[in-house]
Each structure stands twice: as C-alpha cells, then as structure tokens.
C-alpha cells in the first residue's frame, strides 16, 4: 500500500489516496500501527483522500488512537497539496468535504508545487449544546465559559467549536506550563460529552499569541489548525486580541483572521516529507 508522510508545522499525518485505490478495511488498527513512532511510520494520525459527491474530494481523518475526528486544519492543508500534486484536483480554489462540512481552500502554487494554503474554516460555533459542553457552562456576552477543578486549582475555559470541540485557557508562562499534566484531565472532563481539544494560550500583544495544544485522542502535538482558530476566537471574545492574529505554535506560525462575515480563515504551510510503501506482514 502506497502512502505519503506530510506535515503542517510538525503536525504530521500519513496520507492514503483512496480515489485511485481502495479504502482500508480495518482503519482503526491500521491507524494505530502506522502512527506508532517506533514500530510504524510515525504520525499524529491517518488521513484518507476519498471521492465526494458534494465537493472536489473528501477527507477522512483519524487520530493516532484510531478515533475518527471531524476536522484537522493542518491536515486539510496537506490534503489539498497532495490532491493537487497527484492531479486529483486542478484548480487553485478547491473544496474538500469533511465531517464538519465543506471547506473552501485557496492554494498558493509556486513552480507547480503548493507552498501555502488558505482555508476558510467556516464560522465558529458558540452554542454550548453544539460545541458540545454540558449545561453547567455559563454564557457570558457570547462566550461559553466553563470551569474544571484540577488538583485544587480552578481552570477557566472558553469553549469554541470549529467543527470539533475546543476549550481555551489563558496562562502566563506557556513555555513552562505543565501541558502533559493538565491536558488529559481537561480533555476527559465530565463537562465535555465528546471530550475536547485543549489549548493553552499566552497573549503576547493584540496581534500575537503563543499556543500549545493537547489534542483529543493524540496528546500534545506541535500544532493544531482548528485549535489556533479557536484560540483566536476565544482571545478576541475576551478582549485580549484583535481579530487578525499571528499564532506561534511549537511547530511554527499560522496566520488566523476572524473575518467580518464571521468566517475564520487560516493560512499556513503544507509539506511533503516522503512517500513509501506499507508492507503488511
């Protein structure tokens, strides 16, 4: 089985072309094995490029634990790059179907290769039941607020969905914050019926934030596109930043803009690392 290893700011996935080939049968098991960084290819998960009846193509995304996710911002940029360079799509503007809806993408092409991709991520979801977060959450001036107690410390969260659930908390020293300690507790908190991706954000100024992320089903990763979008929405709603923000992640920077039409746009790189053949012994 041929595959491609790709990454967006270090958020890396294994990609399989299921338009010219067949979809794997036991996807969860395959994802577990491919994602293993010692005994497999090594990745944050698996992404399948599939045929779509409503868009140019369909993206199915699986976390490293085999669970299927609605959307991945870094993953969809790489999916668009791969589709273009394989000849599955031919235009600079394309559409990709995901479990969180159809996304429109603009490809920046240099010498026949896709360098960066701008994604219209759609409008943020700011209704508690649709994020989803339990009824214990409070609504404060369009913000969905929640509190989780971790080791006798109350962690305040601003909850947002970009097609998948996110909870953003603001910290003073992101570099030394114990993400691996707090992340899994917050991810699995009872207030999140579908669990949640957790963003830890340090505000630098009105146009810059630093972010680390604990991804649902994957743990801490170097970057998360939907997380960056959610963090900018939360930062803006809380009055910490403007609506156009440079997000500094462990793997690099993303440009996020919450447009006047309420849609969030994300621009960032997409890189092919290598292609190979998975030998299933």
Label the model's feature ranges.
Residues 1-113, 167-281:
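A glycine-rich beta-to-alpha transition motif near the start of alpha/beta enzyme domains, typified by
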Residues 156-157, 165-168:
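Selected transmembrane alpha-helices and immediately adjacent juxtamembrane segments
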Residues 160-162, 184:
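Membrane-interfacial helix-loop segments of redox and metal-homeostasis proteins
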Residues 115-124:
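Membrane helix-loop-helix hairpins that form the core translocation module of multi-pass transporters
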Residues 128-139, 275-280:
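Extended Gly/Ser/Thr-rich low-complexity repeat segments
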Residues 1-22, 119, 137-160:
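N-terminal, positively charged, Ser/Thr/Ala/Gly-biased leader segments
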Residues 123-125, 162-166, 270:
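Glycine-rich beta-alpha junction loops
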